[in-house]
Amino acid sequence: MRRKTGGLTPLIYVGPAVIFLLIYQMYPALQTIYLSFLDRRSEAFVGLENYKYVFTSQVMLTAFKNNLLWLVFFTVGTVSLGLLFAILVDKVKYESFAKSIIFMPMAISFVGAGVVWKFMYTYKPPGSGQIGLLNQILVIFGFEPKGWLLESPINNFALIVVGLWIWTGYCMVLLSAAYKGIPKELVEAAEVDGANQLQVFRHITIPELRPALTMVVTTMLVNVLKIFDIIYVMTNGNFGTEVIANRMFKEMFQFSNTGRASAIAVVLFLMIIPIMYANVRQKLREG
């Protein structure tokens, strides 16, 4: 009897988690895949028609292109700036205060940040009173105001700047913790051997930070693929700024097309899988 009870004990502990996983993750995922093969009202089977829309429609091709733009500039920007601030702030006297200032945008909701930056980018025709901070500065120095959110491709980069402003502090905090974990003996030994700061950074700092960098990069990549809040609040995907997640939202709630929205969700999920696989593989190597 005791042996049987011992065999059931792991199931008792794991069972609720497995049931929760099946109900709230596996079932919705499978249902989404099923709905992606149905029409807008989930009444008739349409085969791969929704996936054809995802990969051939002009609006989705624009969304893929913009997500790729975010993938490159946002990821490189946040990780590079985060690493730079992590190293520089570690050397200043008021480290905690400096970190708090840089990290502060993360404390603001992404919707709130989008609203603030939308006002900063606000455009009025030349000759009108400018209420946007950036255009007011341009006018003061004798330049014409720019439609930061209206003109492509500058509007995509203007949106990416908002993402950098929000997420750089997050990257800095994670990389700063890893940077402080680098043994000082390694750095001192390298300096004794005649290594300059660039060589120390290349041969000691980067290799020691590689696990943290991998985690931060994969986190930023996932954030890029599902970027939504900033786009929705500031442009709603108009003027050539559409992205995958925002298009999925529109298809589902604005156009009531469940089939297309589900197909976009499935494609987005498949795009995230390789990133998560690389992250898990890195963790297993470290273990």
Predicted regions and their residues:
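A structural signal for multi-pass alpha-helical bundles of membrane permease subunits
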Residues: R2-G287
